[in-house]
Amino acid sequence: MVLLLTLTLLFGFILALLIEPIIIKISFKKGFFDKPNERKIHHSTHIPRLGGICFLPITAIVCTVMLSAGFRLEKHWIIDIFSPHQMHFLYFAVSAFVLFCFGALDDLWGVRYRTKFIGQVIAGIILCVSGMWISDLHGLFGLHHISPVLGFPITIFAIVFITNAINFIDGIDGLASSICMLALAYFTIVFYLNENYDYAIISVALAGPVLGFMLFNLFGNPDRRTKIFMGDTGSLFLGFALSVLGVAMNRYTGGNAHYNSFVLGFAPVILPCFDVMRVVLVRRRQGRNAFIADKNHIHHKFMSLGLSQHVVLIIVDILTIVFAAMAIVMAQYINVNIVLIVLLLMWTGLNIILPNHFNDKKE
């Protein structure tokens, strides 16, 4: 199984290395750039923005090939995919494709944020219809098993919230993709340890193209036309995928009495969720549109200290790991609601200490 997971990662990674240069070439030919403006870090350079458009196709190809290989080599577990999880995977593919289309339209021609929001809700509804919804909050807000009447709206809200959290935090090179890589590595390990091998393969299949993209995003040179951004296609798809994996983990790891399954499912995305929640509240308090981007995210706060993008990337990734680890460990010993309060207080304190505004001159 470890060999199969490794081959899955390499397959997706190699495909991304082959496809991303083609996307860059087409982007320059057709003029699909991230437009420079005063808000963006790269405010003086035209850089292609379609790096994430290959995530879904590569993931689909890799999953099809490797799950088929697993069926031939490991029939004792893979056969389960074609019974209870069959509809979940099918509906996940359909809902991911819906969101992929909305993201691609935005990257290619631009669409209003309300349109993208509608697409996210549609994707969430499709997933709930498949039977993949949050049926147990494991003590959060004092609730445990819940009915579809409550579970469906909560699931759709979680999907939209996490999807936007990843989309919003995609502000400096490698940040959204590295957070997603950390989350996917985590999901792979936990699903593997819980013998949910099908979801482990899906997690690795998602990680491969993201890892390949990161090489071009982090180390590409704009002057040599080797740099590319993820775009909304990539960030929306990855945010949606992480939310679905979180819902799946919440449903299928309930047999472990030592860990809170709700925390297990959503611990990797705590930091981006806290960040988007704070940013939206600040924008609304200032009377601004919650979906109009600014320079008030956690990475902007660190950059206002004069730190480079790569240093900020490492700091935020470390914070992501710290918040996730603390949530998982604390939830073993204390009430999940107290865990949430403690983490919120830590996050609030961190944002109070850091500067309130991004200073362009320091950048």
Task: List PLM regions with ranges.
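"…together with the soluble PPM/PP2C metallo-phosphatase catalytic core" -> "…together
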Residues: 2-276
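C-terminal membrane-associated helical module and adjoining short loops/tails
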Residues: 250-363
